[in-house]
Design a protein with these regions (language model features):
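N-terminal first-folded block
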Residues: 7-41
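Aromatic-residue detector
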Residues: 19, 32-34, 38, 63-65, ...
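Hydrophobic coiled-coil of the DHp/HisKA dimerization-phosphotransfer domain
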Residues: 5-7, 55
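Enriched for short, Lys/Arg-rich terminal
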Residues: 2-5, 13, 24, 65-95
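Basic/aromatic recognition patch in beta-strand/loop cores that engages polyanionic ligands
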Residues: 40-81
Length: 95
């Protein structure tokens, strides 16, 4: 059974801050890596973001969580501020 991707309600804001090249690159990485094997490509996070994973794409980070066969993407930001932004978002909204 393949994975299904769901997005946090604020992900659109993250993507709107990126240029078209970066958005395309991130979209391709999600399709090529996360849909195929999110456990292999994502690194587990620790501390306040324990239970989440991160996918590195150049200077950007995709923070996600795996729940059964769903990949819930919480945010996409530059590596310098991703952790602070994600921690401030709190619980995942699966919609």
């Amino acid at each position: 059974m393949p994975y299904i991707i769901k997005y946090h309600k604020t992900l659109k804001e993250d993507l709107n801050e990126l240029d078209e090249f970066s958005r395309s690159r991130i979209r391709k990485a999600i399709e090529a890596r996360l849909l195929i094997d999110p456990l292999k490509y994502g690194q587990l996070l620790k501390g306040t973001l324990k239970g989440f994973r991160i996918l590195r794409i150049g200077g950007y980070r995709v923070v996600y969580k795996i729940v059964k066969k769903e990949i819930i993407i919480l945010g996409v930001r530059h590596r310098k501020d991703i952790y602070e932004i994600i921690a401030s978002r709190g619980e995942i909204n699966k919609r």
